[in-house]
């Protein structure tokens, strides 16, 4: 099936196996119920997928709905990290129609896998009933601003307020939550203000710097020049001259914030667990691809 719905090219495709061994630092499996993502984030690293999928359409304007053989032995994934949404958002608006992510969660019940769901949507609230049955599950929302105007410039996903509301509902349902402050835009993202909003409803507060590579570097640099011209020298220093002092200063700032609020300050995710309300673990993930190892220890590898 192929059709255009609300300006999005929708295809239904067959796949032999929905579970893919992951190359992510956390290991385990990467699971993407869709190909493509209709949030159309301007800074999305996943847009590189077009090189492998053969899509000619602009990123954010297409979505392949996967069909896969039922997972009949979920126990096979016991103890494994399963990341849902590494190069898509399983809770994109089309999930409401096709239900692929809910079907996947139903098939993983009883797996005893360590499941991480990455999203920018509040639709995940629909599946709280399943999340409770899965046990070791974490839901992470990307929130890098409290300003809806900047958010709207960057993506077409759920509003910031809806994401924060969803995080609260999931947290209060007893499910581990993450506020993923990513990407941190220099001079724009105020992570302390975000922390104040979410500290009582998340277990992890994760910081990651904006990486500019590939085709979207020009997109972002042009956006900054047009909307934030006073920040052009800073972005030139960071992304053309590769000066790291700005993010090094943010690391110091984040560590001071951790001490102020009596929060653990680590360089990678700690093993699965909950923390006292109001004291989320603060994860310093700046430049992680260069200085972090593959072990999920919570310690920096130098």
Spell out what each predicted region is.
Residues 109, 132, 165-174, 255-259:
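Surface-exposed amphipathic alpha-helices with a cationic face
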Residues 156, 168-189, 240-244:
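Conserved strand-turn element in the central/C-terminal portion of the radical SAM core barrel
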Residues 87-89, 120-122, 142-146, 182-184, ...:
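Active-site beta-loop-alpha junctions enriched in small/polar residues
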């Amino acid at each position: 099936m192929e059709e255009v719905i609300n300006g999005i090219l929708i295809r239904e495709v067959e796949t032999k196996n929905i579970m893919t061994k992951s190359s992510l630092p956390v290991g385990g499996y990467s699971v993407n119920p869709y190909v493509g993502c209709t949030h159309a984030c301007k800074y999305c690293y996943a847009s590189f997928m077009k090189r492998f999928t053969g899509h000619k359409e602009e990123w954010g304007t297409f979505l392949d709905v996967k069909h896969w053989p039922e997972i009949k032995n979920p126990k096979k994934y016991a103890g494994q990290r399963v990341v849902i949404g590494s190069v898509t958002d399983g809770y994109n608006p089309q999930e409401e129609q096709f239900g692929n992510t809910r079907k996947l969660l139903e098939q993983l019940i009883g797996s005893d896998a360590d499941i991480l769901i990455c999203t920018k949507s509040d639709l995940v609230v629909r599946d709280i009933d399943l999340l409770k049955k899965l046990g070791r599950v974490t839901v992470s929302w990307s929130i890098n601003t409290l300003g809806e105007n900047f958010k709207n410039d960057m993506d077409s996903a759920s509003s910031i307020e809806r994401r924060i509301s969803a995080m609260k509902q999931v947290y209060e349902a007893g499910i581990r939550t993450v506020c993923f402050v990513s990407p941190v835009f220099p001079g724009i993202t105020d992570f302390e203000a975000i922390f104040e909003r979410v500290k009582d409803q998340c277990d992890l507060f994760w910081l990651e710097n904006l990486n500019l590579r590939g085709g979207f570097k020009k997109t972002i640099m042009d956006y900054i020049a047009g909307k934030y011209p006073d920040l052009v020298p800073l972005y030139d220093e960071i992304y053309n001259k590769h000066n790291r002092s700005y993010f090094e200063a943010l690391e110091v700032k984040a560590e001071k914030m951790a001490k102020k609020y009596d929060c653990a300050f680590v360089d990678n995710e700690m093993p699965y667990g909950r923390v006292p309300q109001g004291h989320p673990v603060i994860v310093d993930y700046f430049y992680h691809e260069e200085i972090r190892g593959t072990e999920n220890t919570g310690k920096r590898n130098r």
